């Protein structure tokens, strides 16, 4: 496999785009490689400008639960496109999508559509602070909630990949109200409550940006109890896990009803769309009813709303979708672990629904510190081997992988076979 055209494209991109990419992880810096420049996607596959194709376990970082270029979703988008791209006015589609989202999640009375996960979490926190009338926020090490200033404190994903606990350019005053607790640790969390005047807590119930690290059930239930004890608003960030782990996101696994929740990725089916929502008494503080301002020129634009609505309709029609996707994710996780064990390579694997993760680590990973103990050099070698064998994995050991509906057992078994070849070559130093 060659990437000559991609190498040239990347060099050209770096002349006019900062870093050559529009999101840092895409640069392949942590795996010491060159990103393939993608020409098209179809189903479970990506096709690059060098005529290579890959089984895609990234799926645009999660949104494409039905894979690339799904015909039904595409057709619906095209029909809406013919009527216009954006109006800046209310549309019936927005109301329909809101109803569909609300019907899937307990405790959700109203939502507000936005264009990105960052907007959703930023707006939810502003709203929670207004409702609680308290400024301090608790987040958790390794959880990523977008790139708004107050949340870039010990975030996962890119910050972990590049060895930075936060970001330059964020004034101390922006983060002084952000308290950071250890994931899956109630004692650490209550210490944060005692330190400040905490108005809200935000957490990924199924963390996907320090690798895949699900919350322990007793921890999440305990966190809900702490929020009630200290009268703080609980925000579940389900931008990644919502409609991915299950139809009801994390609620199927934990049964926790938050005060506010954020969704993204799947609800836009690959177009820019996210939302936040919760109890009516909180949501009604938003302008134009209340005094909490939030707005967006393209919020609820018809193309993204149509894409998301089409995806949700398909999900609800397919009663065995999540069962099948989970089975494939389990097959992949178990296959990778068995292959690694045969070469005496330490590898921890797990999945939640169609989300999967793996760590080159001797022990199970339950928090950010555990994740940071993983062998990132081994991951980089493995990633490069798999890429050149036609398997496209997330280009950071602190990211999550995804299964899509067009994938088959044969594709999973092929990926495991390529992993076996890769481990063999790594051990032999080839």
UniProtKB/Swiss-Prot annotation:
UniProt pathway: Porphyrin-containing compound metabolism; protoporphyrin-IX biosynthesis; 5-aminolevulinate from L-glutamyl-tRNA(Glu): step 2/2
Leading EC class: isomerase
Annotated transmembrane regions: none
GO BP, sorted A to Z: protoporphyrinogen IX biosynthetic process
Classification via Pfam families: Aminotran_3
Residues with PTM N6-(pyridoxal phosphate)lysine: 265
Subcellular location: Cytoplasm
Entry GO terms, CC: cytoplasm
Entry cofactors: pyridoxal 5'-phosphate
Keyword set, alphabetical order: Cytoplasm, Isomerase, Porphyrin biosynthesis, Pyridoxal phosphate
Keyword Mitochondrion: no
EC number: 5.4.3.8
Catalytically driven reaction(s): (S)-4-amino-5-oxopentanoate = 5-aminolevulinate
Family: Belongs to the class-III pyridoxal-phosphate-dependent aminotransferase family. HemL subfamily.
Subunit structure, interactors included: Homodimer.
Record's protein name: Glutamate-1-semialdehyde 2,1-aminomutase
Native organism taxonomy: Bacteria, Pseudomonadati, Campylobacterota, Epsilonproteobacteria, Campylobacterales
């Amino acid at each position: 496999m060659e990437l000559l055209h991609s190498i040239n494209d990347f060099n050209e991109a770096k002349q006019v785009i900062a870093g050559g990419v529009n999101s840092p992880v895409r640069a392949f810096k942590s795996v010491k490689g060159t990103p393939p420049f993608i020409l098209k996607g179809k189903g479970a596959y990506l096709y690059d400008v060098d005529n290579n194709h890959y089984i895609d376990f990234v799926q645009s970082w999660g949104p494409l639960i039905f894979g690339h270029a799904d015909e039904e979703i595409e057709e619906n988008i095209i029909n809406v496109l013919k009527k216009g791209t954006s109006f800046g006015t209310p549309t019936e589609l927005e109301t329909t999508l809101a109803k569909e989202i609300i019907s899937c999640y307990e405790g959700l009375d109203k939502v507000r559509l936005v264009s990105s996960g960052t907007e959703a979490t930023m707006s939810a926190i502003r709203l929670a602070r207004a409702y609680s009338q308290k400024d301090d926020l608790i987040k958790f090490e390794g959880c990523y909630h977008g790139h708004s200033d107050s949340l870039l404190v010990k975030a996962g994903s890119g910050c972990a990949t590049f060895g930075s606990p936060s970001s330059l350019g964020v004034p101390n005053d922006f983060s002084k109200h952000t308290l950071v607790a250890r994931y899956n640790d109630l004692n650490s969390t209550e210490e944060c409550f005692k330190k400040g005047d905490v108005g809200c807590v935000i957490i990924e119930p199924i963390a996907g940006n320090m690798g895949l690290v699900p919350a322990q059930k007793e921890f999440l239930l305990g966190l809900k109890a702490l929020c009630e004890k200290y009268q703080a608003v609980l925000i579940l960030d389900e931008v990644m896990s919502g409609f991915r782990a299950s139809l009801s996101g994390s609620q199927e696994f934990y049964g926790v009803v938050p005060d506010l929740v954020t969704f993204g990725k799947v609800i836009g089916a690959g177009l820019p769309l996210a939302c936040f929502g919760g109890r009516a008494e909180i949501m009604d503080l938003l302008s134009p009813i209340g005094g909490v301002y939030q707005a967006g020129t393209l919020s609820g634009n018809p193309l993204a709303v149509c894409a998301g609505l089409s995806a949700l309709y398909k999900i609800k029609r397919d009663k065995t979708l999540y069962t099948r996707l989970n089975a494939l994710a389990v097959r992949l996780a178990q296959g990778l672990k068995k292959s690694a064990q045969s070469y005496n390579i330490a590898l921890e694997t797990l999945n939640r629904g169609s989300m999967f993760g793996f760590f080159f680590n001797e022990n199970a990973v339950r928090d950010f510190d555990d994740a940071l103990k993983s062998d990132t050099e081994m991951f980089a070698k493995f990633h490069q081997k798999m890429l050149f064998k036609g398997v496209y994995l997330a280009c950071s050991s602190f990211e999550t992988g995804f299964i899509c509906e067009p994938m088959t057992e044969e594709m999973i078994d092929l990926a495991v076979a390529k992993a076996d070849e890769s481990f063999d070559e790594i051990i032999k130093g080839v």
